[in-house]
Amino acid sequence: MAPSFDTLSEQDLHEEEEEEIDFSDLKEQFEVKLEEGLDTFIVIDGLPIVPEESRQKLIKFLLRKLNAVGHTSEDAVFMPTNDKNMSEGFAFVEYETPEQAIAAVKQLHGTPLDKKHTLAVNKLMDIDRYGREGRIDEEYKPPTVEPFKEKEHLRSWLSDPNARDQFALYRNDKVGVFWNNKNNPPENVVDRAHWTQLFVQWSPKGTYLASVHPQGVQLWGGPAFSKQKQFPHPFVQLVEFSPGESYLTTWSSRPIQVEEGHPVLSFEEDGKNIIVWDIVSGKPLRSFVSHDLAGGPVEGDAAPKKKVQWPAFKWSADEKYVARMLQGQSISIYELPRMNLLGKTSVKIDGVMDFEWSPATVTRDGVKQYEQLLSFWTPEIGSNPARVALMSVPSKEIVRTRNLFNVSDVKLHWQSQGTYVCVKVDRHSKSKKSMATNLEIFRVREKGVPVEVVDSLKDTVINFAWEPNGGRFVLITTGEAPSGAAVLPKTSVSFFAPEKKGPQAGNFKLVRTIEKKTSNAIYWSPKGRFVVVATVHSQSNFDLDFWDMDFEGEKAEGEKDLAANLQLMKTVEHYGVTDIDWDPTGRYVVSSASVWTHSMENGWNIHTFAGQTLAEHPTDKFKQFVWRPRPPTLLSKEEQKQVRKNLREYSKEFDEEDKYAVDIANTAVVETRKRVLNEWVAWLRREKELMAEEKDAYGIPEDADDAKVAKDAPPVSEDQGEAVVEEIVEEIVEENEEVIG
């Protein structure tokens, strides 16, 4: 019988216990875990070779850098020496945790120790893993040089001979990129199913198209839109590019879970929500846990809603700095590309609610050193008033402050060139029963940064927008709407422009106010001058008003001292409109109705800057329309002035080209009709020839088809023979299918 548990006696069981003693607890206590023990060690190469008496001095100097990324001590640094009592140029360092060792490798590798020495930092486990016997061939083999493969031109679309613009169209499960052909059907460049799972997004200069997937973000580019880069961030939901397309920020509400051996992500990213990436290398620079913002007022016992802070990181105009805010406490400014905290500390600002970088590098009057400007605001805390301030970076110097009282909310609006920053202040009365808005406009480039106050507004401002590259702005105000009102409250649209006073812009004055509107959105042309004021996301009003701020007609008497001549060019209606997008040249405007908002009459319409509707494109399950941005012009200011000066001459050429294009289109229609007619004539000729052959075969006269000849023709005699034509018709009355077993 085969031995089994059932056949063993009680004595046998006790004998087995006496023979084998369980040492598992002792083994677990005293076993040396080689893999875990070495995870905290790093190897630093590239150190100066110094004598024994200078070794401790070098270690202390090295500790300044080592402790900037983790915690270690002088005893945890081993720097070996040779027979001549000289150091070997490398050292072993032990950190408290493996995470600190990983951070040291990422942040210290490649950093200069002094002018002559650059650190090379690696994990000790990596050296053991890749340098052990058998991993490296003893015999040198020259590397194989891959044949040169020319990369795609990532800005090839700019060389289009007709200077057309491209756009991305997301509908149903397909994403396509098309050329804009004005009122003609758009020309397809590429169209792919399941190209993205959430949305698509162009980079700021139009070089890349980003698609979002559960696995991460992919960047596409070139004439064929081939894959350029990929950034693995599981369940990514939001994407943000830096202004110069050098960096990328990704966010997910789910903390990242990094699997062992991941080719890109390390344990440093584990548990984080945000990753800042280097686009060129495709590697993460640093990862962070996201900070939620305080939500709005909560009714009853409901849990407070968390609001996502996005963009979580905001970039300076030159990409040298990126900052994030811990609401109510501080602003952390990081230097790129190392992502080190500027000055090794965050800027402590009690109560800070929001901040914004200047969108351009500003040169202030009387200030010669380089700086980036950052504006922020804090609410009223106790007896301290609310405060708006401008901070210079990297010095962290406060260059201007402004105290505010009875403040409910503040919004910061920078002009595109950094010339002005408008602080929109919503104030409540002392009884807190009524609200009003006033504007505090900082003139950043002027000496001392003077502040101009616009306090003529009686109602609350719900939207504000600066003119790009200009000094004018548009705002929308509304009175207090009764709670629960089903009808949109009436709004007023106000246009402001500076006075004409010498070389510098004068004070801002009201040009005109248009009352009894329902408008709630402002869309400036990227080139300035033209603006669309619209009603979006409404169930009852869908107006788009096209305005010209520099109308060339006669100017109203009361507006002659202002740098504006306002004229309504046209009002159009687009049912269910949800989004409005200007093309980067300011020539065309697209209004669209997305299925993400509602499912009624989805699609997109294209208009000229003056409001003429060129084409309507009803599209089932339409989701997103995005124009492809253009990089900044390479022309100097003088060359741009020359182009504007000769614009009328260029316009004649463009008119000729447009006329030629219309003629070509008409010629194409005529040619198509001629081709179809010629094909029909050729077919008719062939049929007549076949009929003539058949008549000849049967002895039928050529003119037998003529009605008169057919009537007068003699009857066919018997001796001429008869032709009998039989027609067999088969009809299935019933059909049965029987299986014979």
From Swiss-Prot:
<keyword id="KW-0694">RNA-binding</keyword>
<feature type="compositionally biased region" description="Polar residues">
    <location>
        <begin position="1"/>
        <end position="10"/>
    </location>
</feature>
<keyword id="KW-0963">Cytoplasm</keyword>
<protein>
    <recommendedName>
        <fullName>Eukaryotic translation initiation factor 3 subunit B</fullName>
    </recommendedName>
</protein>
<dbReference type="GO" id="GO:0071540">
    <property type="term" value="C:eukaryotic translation initiation factor 3 complex, eIF3e"/>
</dbReference>
<keyword id="KW-0648">Protein biosynthesis</keyword>
<feature type="domain" description="RRM">
    <location>
        <begin position="40"/>
        <end position="126"/>
    </location>
</feature>
<dbReference type="InterPro" id="IPR012677">
    <property type="entry name" value="Nucleotide-bd_a/b_plait_sf"/>
</dbReference>
<dbReference type="Pfam" id="PF08662">
    <property type="entry name" value="eIF2A"/>
</dbReference>
<feature type="repeat" description="WD 2">
    <location>
        <begin position="232"/>
        <end position="289"/>
    </location>
</feature>
<feature type="repeat" description="WD 1">
    <location>
        <begin position="193"/>
        <end position="230"/>
    </location>
</feature>
<keyword id="KW-0853">WD repeat</keyword>
<dbReference type="GO" id="GO:0001732">
    <property type="term" value="P:formation of cytoplasmic translation initiation complex"/>
</dbReference>
<comment type="subunit">
    <text>Component of the eukaryotic translation initiation factor 3 (eIF-3) complex.</text>
</comment>
<dbReference type="InterPro" id="IPR034363">
    <property type="entry name" value="eIF3B_RRM"/>
</dbReference>
<dbReference type="InterPro" id="IPR035979">
    <property type="entry name" value="RBD_domain_sf"/>
</dbReference>
<dbReference type="GO" id="GO:0042802">
    <property type="term" value="F:identical protein binding"/>
</dbReference>
<dbReference type="GO" id="GO:0003743">
    <property type="term" value="F:translation initiation factor activity"/>
</dbReference>
<keyword id="KW-0677">Repeat</keyword>
<dbReference type="GO" id="GO:0003723">
    <property type="term" value="F:RNA binding"/>
</dbReference>
<dbReference type="GO" id="GO:0033290">
    <property type="term" value="C:eukaryotic 48S preinitiation complex"/>
</dbReference>
<dbReference type="GO" id="GO:0031369">
    <property type="term" value="F:translation initiation factor binding"/>
</dbReference>
<dbReference type="GO" id="GO:0071541">
    <property type="term" value="C:eukaryotic translation initiation factor 3 complex, eIF3m"/>
</dbReference>
<dbReference type="GO" id="GO:0043614">
    <property type="term" value="C:multi-eIF complex"/>
</dbReference>
<feature type="region of interest" description="Disordered">
    <location>
        <begin position="696"/>
        <end position="723"/>
    </location>
</feature>
<dbReference type="GO" id="GO:0010494">
    <property type="term" value="C:cytoplasmic stress granule"/>
</dbReference>
<feature type="repeat" description="WD 5">
    <location>
        <begin position="572"/>
        <end position="610"/>
    </location>
</feature>
<feature type="region of interest" description="Disordered">
    <location>
        <begin position="1"/>
        <end position="21"/>
    </location>
</feature>
<dbReference type="GO" id="GO:0016282">
    <property type="term" value="C:eukaryotic 43S preinitiation complex"/>
</dbReference>
<dbReference type="Pfam" id="PF00076">
    <property type="entry name" value="RRM_1"/>
</dbReference>
<dbReference type="InterPro" id="IPR015943">
    <property type="entry name" value="WD40/YVTN_repeat-like_dom_sf"/>
</dbReference>
<comment type="function">
    <text>RNA-binding component of the eukaryotic translation initiation factor 3 (eIF-3) complex, which is involved in protein synthesis of a specialized repertoire of mRNAs and, together with other initiation factors, stimulates binding of mRNA and methionyl-tRNAi to the 40S ribosome. The eIF-3 complex specifically targets and initiates translation of a subset of mRNAs involved in cell proliferation.</text>
</comment>
<feature type="repeat" description="WD 3">
    <location>
        <begin position="303"/>
        <end position="344"/>
    </location>
</feature>
<comment type="similarity">
    <text>Belongs to the eIF-3 subunit B family.</text>
</comment>
<keyword id="KW-0396">Initiation factor</keyword>
<dbReference type="InterPro" id="IPR013979">
    <property type="entry name" value="TIF_beta_prop-like"/>
</dbReference>
<dbReference type="InterPro" id="IPR011400">
    <property type="entry name" value="EIF3B"/>
</dbReference>
<feature type="repeat" description="WD 4">
    <location>
        <begin position="514"/>
        <end position="557"/>
    </location>
</feature>
<dbReference type="InterPro" id="IPR000504">
    <property type="entry name" value="RRM_dom"/>
</dbReference>
